[in-house]
Amino acid sequence: MDAKIKPLRGGKPADARPEFQPAELDPSEFLAAAVQPDQPRPSRTEAEQAVKTLLAYIGENTGREGLLDTPRRVVEAYDELFQGYHQCPAEVLDRTFGETAGYDDFVLVRDIGFTSHCEHHVMPFYGKAHIAYTPVERVVGLSKLARLVEIFARRLQTQEHLTAQIAAAIDEVLKPRGVAVMIEAEHTCMSVRGIGKQGASTFTSRYTGMFRDNPAEQARFMSMIRSRG
């Protein structure tokens, strides 16, 4: 007699995959400033020399008039573009209001514009972040969510990692019932180099708590993002 294969609990087929759980991020990775004051770094002079070396590598004459100040300007631009390494996400989210006045639904801030740089080619990618969370006791000022996006965006990133870091930081500091983050962005490493396809958008999302566990809440989050009424 042929052996009978018993179905898994809940009627799932025998070859069903276990439910996926996203990897947890190490809080030390995103809750503190990435660069500490006592951390050894190259000097500004060394950084400017590195820029000069790259200019020479592509075939430029680094001594011509138009490039004399370029190394200094590039280093100053990097100081601005990557200032997120010196800023602490936890400090931004730690300034909260302790009273929700009985509010028990989620808070959504959408269309938070940002520009970041990919860690593969150090080329810009830019777009919008949409963030929702359902508070328990702590409510953060709405501008702080935009500030959080700015801090993480001003570091070398992948879009996937940026999405996960934003969600994890809110989840860890505010302890809400759930967090939803969606990012839509265009990557210049795809539009101006390589395949050279302009206008293509990449979407990433991350859900925690009630959003991860309840598809209806995910659908409502998506509906409110798309609504323009």
UniProtKB/Swiss-Prot annotation:
One of the record's GO molecular function terms: GTP cyclohydrolase I activity
Entry-linked InterPro entries: GTP-CH-I_C/QueF, GTP-CH-I_N, GTP_CycHdrlase_I, GTP_CycHdrlase_I_CS, GTP_CycHdrlase_I_dom
GO cellular component terms, A-Z: cytoplasm
Residue segments, region Disordered: 1-26
Top-level class of the enzyme under EC nomenclature: hydrolase
Binding site for Zn(2+): C118, H121, C189
A GO biological-process term: tetrahydrofolate biosynthetic process
Record's keyword terms, sorted: GTP-binding, Hydrolase, Metal-binding, Nucleotide-binding, One-carbon metabolism, Zinc
Pathway this chain belongs to: Cofactor biosynthesis; 7,8-dihydroneopterin triphosphate biosynthesis; 7,8-dihydroneopterin triphosphate from GTP: step 1/1
SUPFAM superfamilies from the UniProt entry: Tetrahydrobiopterin biosynthesis enzymes-like (SSF55620)
Catalysed reactions listed for this entry: GTP + H2O = 7,8-dihydroneopterin 3'-triphosphate + formate + H(+)
Cystines in this chain: none
Top-level lineage group: Bacteria
Assembly and oligomerization: Toroid-shaped homodecamer, composed of two pentamers of five dimers.
Family: Belongs to the GTP cyclohydrolase I family.
Protein name (record): GTP cyclohydrolase 1
